Amino acid sequence: MLDREGYRPNVGIILCNGRNEVFWGKRIREHSWQFPQGGIKRGETPEEAMFRELYEEVGLLPEHVRILGRTKGWLRYEVPTHWIKREWRGSYKGQKQIWFLLRLVGRDSDVNLRATNKPEFDAWRWNDYWVPLDAVIEFKRLVYEQALNELVRFLDFDRKGPRHKKEQEPFSDVVDSVRSEE
C-alpha cells in the first residue's frame, strides 16, 4: 500500500530500557543494524501496527512495554533506486513513518527474536541513545536523527548538544539470539 507520492506507511520503534539505552537489532544474515520497523496494513492504526511489529520482530507483547511518546507527524526517507525491487521502480519512493518511543517494563529475557517463523533480526543489543546515528545505513540517518531528537524529550536525562553520546563501541555486548536460547 503506497500513498499518492509513492511512500509506504510504516511505523518505527525506539525501545528503551531503564538506563535509556535503545534496542538495536542486527538484520538476519546481514551486517546492518536498525530499529524495529514495519508497514501499516490497511485498516490498522499506527499503534496497532507498532504492537504487531514489536511482536513480529522482537517478540514483545503490549504488557512488556509502556508507550512514552510518538512523533507528531510522518517522517520520510527515500530508498536508493538500486535497493528497490524492479517491479516497484517508478511508483515506490520510500517509507513514511510514525515513530514510537517505548519503555521496556518487562525483562531482557522477554525479548524473543524467533517469536514468528520469519525473524527479522538474528542478534540484538542495548546501545547508548545516540549511537544509532553513527551506525544506521546512510539513507535512513536523517529520519533516525529526526525521530531521536523529537522523542528525547520523553526521557529523563540531560542532553548536551544535538548529539550527545557517551564513548561506547557501537557493537560491543551483542546478544546473539542463538547463544541466548541455550
From Swiss-Prot:
Residues 6-149 form the Nudix hydrolase domain. Its cofactor is a divalent metal cation. PROSITE patterns: NUDIX, NUDIX_BOX. It is an enzyme of class 3 (hydrolase). Its EC number is 3.6.1.-. InterPro entries: Nudix_hydrolase, NUDIX_hydrolase-like_dom_sf, NUDIX_hydrolase_CS, NUDIX_hydrolase_dom, RppH. GO terms for molecular function: pyrophosphatase activity. It comes from the Bacteria. Keywords: Hydrolase. Belongs to the Nudix hydrolase family. RppH subfamily. Accelerates the degradation of transcripts by removing pyrophosphate from the 5'-end of triphosphorylated RNA, leading to a more labile monophosphorylated state that can stimulate subsequent ribonuclease cleavage. HAMAP family: Nudix_RppH. This is RNA pyrophosphohydrolase. The gene is rppH.
